[in-house]
Amino acid sequence: MDYKQSNLFLFPIGLGSTYIFYKKICGTFCSIDNDLEVNPYLTHGILMLTLVYFLSDYYLMIVKYNPKHNVYFVHHFIGIVSIYFSYMKYYYLIKYLFAYLTFELSTPFLNIAIKYRNQGVYNKCSIFSELAFFILFTVVRIIFGTYLWFVTSNTLSSIEYPYNYLIVLPTILQFLNYWWYYRILKILRAKLFGCINKED
């Protein structure tokens, strides 16, 4: 889907998940007994919006297949499976799902930055978009994401067999974040010291 449609989903998903995380998960993050229901309409609404986003984008990626986007099939599949298991089978894990959904705070700024780059526009808005994306990606997906990976992996490893193998989901997702971050750093280096490779 195009960047405008994508951002219509991602802004409320990222902001809503951050609000839920801040209000009810912060401070009791490692407790499986904490009450998640900040507002049931908000929590279920964010979950439904996220599921609709993943499924619709998955469908569009199939219809408009581009081999460069194969990694997003993995990303969206992890999201869909995580929603199912955390909502239908292990509801106490849903706090981790909302923590992971805070990752989407960075994506709208990436979409905007790509739009400006494709149009060959370089102005204050494009600079702000790139800077906001880099900072948010670093803080949310790399620093917080690494911590979240360890916490989630520890919790998932204690689930009964065979569902303890769900540990592969946050592991794959975090390594995707590291791979994307490597590419981001390459682009940043090219911006500062040379030309950008169109493949990045």
Swiss-Prot record:
Main location: membrane
Keywords, alphabetical: Membrane, Transmembrane, Transmembrane helix
Domain of life according to the entry: Viruses
Subcellular location: Membrane
UniProt entry tagged with the keyword tRNA processing: no
Keyword Membrane among record annotations: yes
GO biological process, one term: lipid homeostasis
Domain TLC, chain residue ranges per copy: 1-193
Bilayer topology annotation: Multi-pass membrane protein
Membrane-spanning ranges: 9-29, 43-63, 74-94, 96-116, 131-151, 165-185
SMART domains, per the entry: TLC
GO cellular component assignments: membrane
Name of the protein in its database record: Putative TLC domain-containing protein L438
Taxonomic source organism: Acanthamoeba polyphaga mimivirus
